[in-house]
């Protein structure tokens, strides 16, 4: 970090920009489900269909990336507990994140969590180091929406909540 740069101020200012929240899931080398909460998921390209996200020092990401397939589970505003469950590092005493959860396999075999708004299956196209994070570019192979009527979850000023669209 640059000598006069205030990282805390940077986070505080950028916290004013709401971001969507997804849980990226996959299978580890033993075909066990793994996942991590992501607050930087973005659409990158329509043709070809690419999405992307930034990942920090997650202990779950190496297990997911080993298989080169993942599913982005778009969270609803009713899934706060799920967001924090997958946001906590497993080394911090967290139990298996999938214990007691309902999920099914996506088209690529990755977990689709119950109650989400949408799922986006991808293959890892590239992983690029960018500063203190890695940018994961995923090629979309299938995508679906669900019948869940909740609003999307957003991360805003250090908290998660829902977003309401005016005029709906």
PLM region descriptions:
Residues 1-168:
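Basic, polyanion-binding surface patches
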């Amino acid at each position: 970090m640059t000598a006069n740069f205030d990282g805390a101020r940077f986070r505080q200012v950028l916290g004013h920009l709401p971001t969507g929240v997804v849980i990226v899931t996959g299978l580890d080398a033993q075909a066990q489900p793994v996942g991590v909460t992501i607050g930087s998921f973005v659409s990158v390209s329509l043709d070809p269909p690419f999405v992307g996200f930034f990942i920090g020092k997650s202990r779950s990401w190496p297990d997911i990336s080993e298989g080169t397939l993942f599913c982005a589970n778009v969270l609803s505003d009713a899934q706060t507990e799920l967001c924090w469950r997958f946001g906590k590092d497993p080394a911090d005493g967290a139990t298996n994140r999938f214990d007691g959860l309902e999920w099914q396999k996506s088209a690529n075999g990755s977990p689709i969590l119950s109650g989400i708004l949408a799922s986006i299956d991808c293959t890892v196209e590239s992983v690029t180091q960018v500063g203190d994070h890695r940018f994961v570019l995923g090629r979309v192979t299938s995508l679906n929406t669900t019948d869940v009527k909740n609003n999307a979850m957003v991360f805003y000023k250090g908290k998660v909540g829902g977003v309401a669209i005016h005029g709906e």
